[in-house]
């Protein structure tokens, strides 16, 4: 019931076409059920030698009723299409909005391919089910009910024969659903895997071609596609049993009614039931069985779509891990940062902390460098500052206030993060830069690009700042992408700027120009630089050496050379390596 209530809420502004669809279906069914009644009278009048004018009058009435029924059906289809399209639009909007509210912790529960499948294939299935529900799911039960009532009015006990076959039909449908539902559930899960494989392949196409792995990727895709085809074929084979089951029920019932009705007419000479009534009974029998067939179609469709409903509900019912407090602080005073007894793990069930016992104070305007090996939790540390995750123990403060006390948008507006994986979106360079500040002027964008050492190469493009960036920034180099991402971050004019290994694709000269520009033009901004090169952070006011989730050492470059074995080893290996390269 909770699932039904949730999806009914997605009708919203499309209540009117939904209600009109239902009313049209009621009108169509009511007229369709009355037509056999008048047809029976027409047959009896013709058999009894009625005047032609009477026959014509009844015939014209039947034609008019048929046209009205046809009109109701057409309008029902029109309103139903509008309602189902609007319903799907609202479901898609609600799912996308919910995903946008997720923290990294929530997103970690779903793969990106799974979310794409849920917002496309699953919502399309739900839309089809909704369309069937407001049309056929109303039409079929009403037709069954009205036809049974009219059959009893016209045929009395003979109408009971229509109900004999229903238990057979119900048992058959339940057996079909019992087999089909698990099969469709498996199909949708494998769709996630297939989409994940496609997404991964497209994104890494250069790597695939660089290693000549096209054959392997084809085999992997073919195997995933074959698994889906196999499971889907099994599910469809089970569902296909519905059609012969229904045909058996329809033909058996019609033959049985025709046999019993004919015997009654022959035996009683038409005193109990006449030819017109028998013809009407056969029509009502068809309507009853057709309504049951439609109900079985709905049942099969809902069996196929149930897993889609469940998967969409999983997203809609996922509570965002991070929420704003009741009375959030809206202003970040400065760029000072404090870590007080901070420990963190990515899930409550994890046995090991990713960060443990972190205590650190950073004054506003400082430049802080972070070094450490792979897996030392450098990125994890800085992701706690804009509250991409919540700490497990202790607290992180920005501007002297716990980050959990801020409005999330206000906090993240004061913190610019350039992540390891640089992302550009389809659109012009200007469009991408305005992600940092949608109201930025051309002069502000140029200034940010100059500071990020991007202005020169942008101007080298024929269209300059209006150059179109392909999806994922595939038409610019890695270093150019990094510089554009840094410029975008600078446009926010943040109080804290975090560069998470964001200069790895640029040369040492450009890296040095970054640092000089930051010192000169944004001295009030707190700058945190994660790097692999000691040269990138050696001028920092404070350098942290991370090791296995702990701050192993901290100090200036000279202090760490004297006191930190880890730092000294890294520095000497890079210095000696550079000397050997030059030699």
Predicted segments with their positions:
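Juxtamembrane helix-loop junctions of ABC transporter transmembrane domains
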Residues: 23-24, 31-44, 65-112, 116, ...
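ABC-type nucleotide-binding domain
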Residues: 331-583
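Helix-loop-helix
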Residues: 51, 55, 146, 150-164, ...
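Hydrophobic alpha-helical transmembrane segments of ABC transporter permease domains
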Residues: 23, 27, 31-35, 60, ...
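An intracellular "coupling" helix at the cytosolic face of ABC transporter transmembrane type-1 domains
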Residues: 13-16, 101-105, 121-134, 138, ...
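Transmembrane helix-loop-helix hairpins at lipid-water interfaces of multipass membrane proteins
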Residues: 12, 18-75, 79, 152-157, ...
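A short amphipathic helical element positioned immediately N-terminal to and/or at the very start
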Residues: 2-13, 115
């Amino acid at each position: 019931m909770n699932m039904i209530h949730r999806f009914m809420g997605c009708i919203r502004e499309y209540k009117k076409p939904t209600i009109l669809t239902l009313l049209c279906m009621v009108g169509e069914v009511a007229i369709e059920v009355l037509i056999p009644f008048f047809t029976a009278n027409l047959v009896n009048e013709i058999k009894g030698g009625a005047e032609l004018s009477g026959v014509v009058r009844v015939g014209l009435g039947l034609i008019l009723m048929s046209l009205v029924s046809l009109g109701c059906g057409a309008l029902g289809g029109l309103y139903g299409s509008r309602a189902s399209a609007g319903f799907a639009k609202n479901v898609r909007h609600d799912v996308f909005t919910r995903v946008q509210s997720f923290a990294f912790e929530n997103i970690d529960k779903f793969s990106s391919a799974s979310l794409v499948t849920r917002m496309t294939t699953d919502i399309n299935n739900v839309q089809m089910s909704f369309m069937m529900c407001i049309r056929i799911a109303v039409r079929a039960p009403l037709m069954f009910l009205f036809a049974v009532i009219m059959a009893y009015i016209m045929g009395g006990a003979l109408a009971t024969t229509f109900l004999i076959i229903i238990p057979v039909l119900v048992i058959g449908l339940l057996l079909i659903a019992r087999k089909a539902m698990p099969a469709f559930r498996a199909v949708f899960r494998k769709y996630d895997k297939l989409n994940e494989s496609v997404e991964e392949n497209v994104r890494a196409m250069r790597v695939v071609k660089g290693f000549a792995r096209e054959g392997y990727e084809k085999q992997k895709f073919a195997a995933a596609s074959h698994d889906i085809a196999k499971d889907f074929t099994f599910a469809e084979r089970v569902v296909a049993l519905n059609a012969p089951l229904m045909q058996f029920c329809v033909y058996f019932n019609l033959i049985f009614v025709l046999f019993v009705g004919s015997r009654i007419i022959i035996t009683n000479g038409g005193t109990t039931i006449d030819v017109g009534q028998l013809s009407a009974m056969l029509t009502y029998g068809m309507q009853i069985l057709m309504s049951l067939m439609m109900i079985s179609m709905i049942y099969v469709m809902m069996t196929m779509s149930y897993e889609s409903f469940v998967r969409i509900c999983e997203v809609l019912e996922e509570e965002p891990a991070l929420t704003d407090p009741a009375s959030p602080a809206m202003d970040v005073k400065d760029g000072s940062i404090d870590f007080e007894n901070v420990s963190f793990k990515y899930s409550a069930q994890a046995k090991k902390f990713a960060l443990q016992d972190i205590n650190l104070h950073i004054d506003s305007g400082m430049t802080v460098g972070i070094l450490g090996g792979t897996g030392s939790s450098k990125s994890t540390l800085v992701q706690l500052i804009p509250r991409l995750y919540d700490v497990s123990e202790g607290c992180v403060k920005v501007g002297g206030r716990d980050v959990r006390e801020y409005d999330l948008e206000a906090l993240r507006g004061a913190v610019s993060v350039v992540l390891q994986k640089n992302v550009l979106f389809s659109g012009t360079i200007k469009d991408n830069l305005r992600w940092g500040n949608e109201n930025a002027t051309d002069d502000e964008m140029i200034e940010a690009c100059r500071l990020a050492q991007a202005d020169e190469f942008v101007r080298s493009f024929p269209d300059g700042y209006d150059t179109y960036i392909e999806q994922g920034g595939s038409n610019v180099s890695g270093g150019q992408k990094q510089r554009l991402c840094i410029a975008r971050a600078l446009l926010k004019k943040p109080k804290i700027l975090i560069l998470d290994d964001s200069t790895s694709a640029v040369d040492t000269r450009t890296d040095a120009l970054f640092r000089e520009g930051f010192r000169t033009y944004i001295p009030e901004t707190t700058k945190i630089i994660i790097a692999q090169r000691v040269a990138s952070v050696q001028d920092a006011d404070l350098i942290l050496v991370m090791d296995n989730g702990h701050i192993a050492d901290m100090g200036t470059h000279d202090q760490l050379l004297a006191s930190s074995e880890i730092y000294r080893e890294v520095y000497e290996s890079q210095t000696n390596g550079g000397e050997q390269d030059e030699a």
